Structures are given as structure tokens and as C-alpha cells.
Amino acid sequence: MDGSGKTTQLALLAKWLSASGHRVFVTEWNSSALVKAATRMGKKKNALTPMTFSLLHATDFADRLLYKIVPPLKAGMIVLADRYAYTAFARDVARGVDRQWVRDLYSFAVQPDLALYFRVPIEVSIERLLARRVKLKFYEAGMDMGWSTNPVESFRLFQGKVIEEYERLVDEYGLHVVNASRSITEQQHDVRHLVAAHLGETHDARTGTDE
């Protein structure tokens, strides 16, 4: 969810894993050179419909899966994805796209070994986002849906629907919930504990964010 702090947590996790001797590769949502320019242009003109948005993100994901996710995995690296197919499952459905259609669209996706959901209240998310910039972005706030002309209120309505879908995914796909309302250090402790357990390694509870 926007404003949950997941990007910060992923960066800290990558640093920790690398320091522990692991080879790490990080990939971000909507970062494929193949479609990034088209997505940026569509956003600039406010021309993206829910279906178009969904298809563009699926194309981005397919391109990155082929060139940025599978190759590092085959090379024995740990791949950290800042957002995964679950992002589409939540956002696209919140925009009214058929739930099963979206899942079928991403049927080619590799099942991740570990998926984290950074759960954060909407008001905390808004506070964090507005602390970094003057206003909420058009699509980030769900303004394309026409639910409200007020960006903050639109964000509440849109992200409320997104949260409903993420909560559904927790049980459906076994997402691990991280309480993103807590401090960066506390969150990172939990994240490292989950990852270390999956890797079959021990984790020092005293580990901080600066290691």
C-alpha cells in the first residue's frame, strides 16, 4: 500500500542480506523500459482507464519477469521485488476490473517464496505521503475513478478498497503481515526474522536498521 514504507524496508533488507554474504537483486514495479514511457505519458494526460492501466502493468511485469526476475533466480541470487502481482490483484480490482480476470492475466507469474504485506492505516499513509510532497498524485489517489474531487477523500475511498483486496489476499495467498505503523527499526526486525527463518538462518534480535 502507498505510504506503508515498504520501499525503505526492502532497501534495508537488501543491505542486510548483502552484508550477510548473499547476492541480491532488487526489482521495482513499473520499471520496465519497454512500457515505462507509455505509462508515464498516459498518467501525464490522465488517459489511463482501469483496463489500460491493468494491461500496462501486466506488460511491465511480464517483461521484468523474463529479464529481471527469472535470470537472477537461476543464477542463485535472492530477488527482492518492490511490489509483485499482488499489487495488481488489489489495485486493479479496486478500480473495478474483474477479480478472476486479473488473476488469470498474471497466471504466468512465478510464485514467490515469501510475500510480505505492510499493513498501515489509511490516515498514517496519507500523513507519510504528504510529509514528502505537497499533494497526492492523481492515480495514487484514485482520482481517475471520479469518486471525489478532493484528492485526500478520493485517496481514502480508493485505498479503502485496495486494503479490502489485500486483506483478502492474506488468506488466499498466504501473505505475511507486517505492522507498518511501527518504527522502521521494529518493522525491519520482523522482516529480517521472517526472511532468516525462510533461509534457515538465525537472526539476532538486536539487529538494527543501520547494519
Regions found by a protein language model. Name each.
Residues 82-83, 108-132:
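Conserved phosphate-donor/acceptor-positioning beta-strand/loop module used by diverse small-molecule
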Residues 14, 127-211:
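NTP-dependent small-molecule kinase module
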Residues 3:
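Walker A (P-loop) phosphate-binding loop of P-loop NTPases
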Residues 31-33, 85-86, 120-126, 183-184:
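Conserved nucleotide-binding/hydrolysis micro-motifs of P-loop NTPases
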